[in-house]
Amino acid sequence: MPFIVNTDADRESMLHATGVSSFDELIVDIPREVRLNKALELAPAADEMEVRSILESMAAANRSTADYVSFLGGGAYDHFLPSAIKAIVSRSEFYTAYTPYQAEVSQGTLQAIYEYQSLICRLYGMDVTNASMYDGATALAEAVLMAIGVNGRQKVVVAGKLHPWNSSVLKTYLEASDHSAVVQNVVEDGVGSIEVLKGLMDDTVAAVVVQQPNFYGCLEDVEAIGRLAHEHGALFIVSANPVSLGVLEAPGAYGADISVGEGQPLGSSQSFGGPYLGIFSVRQELVRKLPGRLVGMTKDSNGQDGFILTLQTREQHIRREKATSNICSNQALNALQAAVYLSLLGKQGLSEVAGQSLSRAHYLAGRIAAIPGFSIRYNAPFFNEFVVDTPIPPSEVVRKMLEKKVFAGCDLGEFGDEGLLVAVTEKRTKAQLDMFADALGELA
């Protein structure tokens, strides 16, 4: 960043432009008790070698999956990332999160986004996918806002166990509405109760939301939930783990109107929580209500294929009240990572990743269930994640496993729940699974 001077003359000019005579007058609305009335006391300037040493010592305090065996999940997963992903997305032509507005000089980036959209449509079994959303949580919230805008209804029913953070983001998005309400279905044995859900449905429901697999890792009865939604004229919104679709049926196959998801498992590292990728797909009839950006294929004046931004119904292009969303910059770089990941693996490769994650998770669950004092809480089918009841507080399990360089899983106490949420990916070897089970056995 270039150094820009701030001279006395510059400051006088700025104060004059704002109509005040002094800096104190400019900040008069800031209470005096919260103002800094002394020097910042910054550390002395350091040269490059000193700065590198300081930062390396700070980074050494981190605990990462490079050094620890990870069973963390809950929305962010430790999948293997081929080296080619970073090599491709780090190219200067791609290395930006911003949308290419000038189509005539951005055909490569636009085509890459178009390929991402096409791959996600195939994976989720949907007709149209946008260029990306911020993350899975905001994609879900935008899907609900879209449903309310489509049918004009106000009630939203969450059919099963949704990630608590996704629920929080959804409620935040709906706070500005005077009428919208979120109703949570009863969860029994890890999944939403279909019988209770029937009683929640009426002609005021705008959308029925389900996460598949759900927050506990269990598989919801999505076909029954979808039928109930459509019987009452509501839109059916599915938030699906994209890797799970290597072995599970695509949302479009069981009637989803809108499919969203957290795209982190598709080529993005866990990265201490972000940036991630929001997947957003719809059926064709809803395309004009689709939030975010959409890349389409067209013909130029010479009859050659070209790529453009199409259906740009965002607020900076039309009146705010008519806009489909207010998303600005997007996650194009993460979308590119997802496209590269899916292209490298192919259909069979993704199925193998999903299949290995599933089989290894079930092997570990069997090992843990055999340990005295430990049990698998739910009997419902699961993909690669499950809840374990422990003989000692889960927080203690997590702490003791750190001593063995193992991330034991997510302590559900952080979400006002109980138990340990354990996730397994294709990266976990049988030796690591056995080591973890044996270490848990020492705690029994």
UniProtKB/Swiss-Prot annotation:
Keywords assigned = Oxidoreductase
- Mind telling me which SUPFAM superfamilies this protein's record contains? PLP-dependent transferases
Say which enzyme class the record assigns. Answer: oxidoreductase
Decide whether keyword Oxidoreductase is in the record.
yes
What positions belong to coiled-coil segments? none
Enzyme nomenclature, EC number: 1.4.4.2
Family, as annotated: Belongs to the GcvP family. N-terminal subunit subfamily.
Output the NCBIfam families linked to this UniProt entry: PRK00451.1
Q: What is this protein called?
A: Probable glycine dehydrogenase (decarboxylating) subunit 1
Q: What is the lineage of its organism?
A: Bacteria, Pseudomonadati, Chlorobiota, Chlorobiia, Chlorobiales
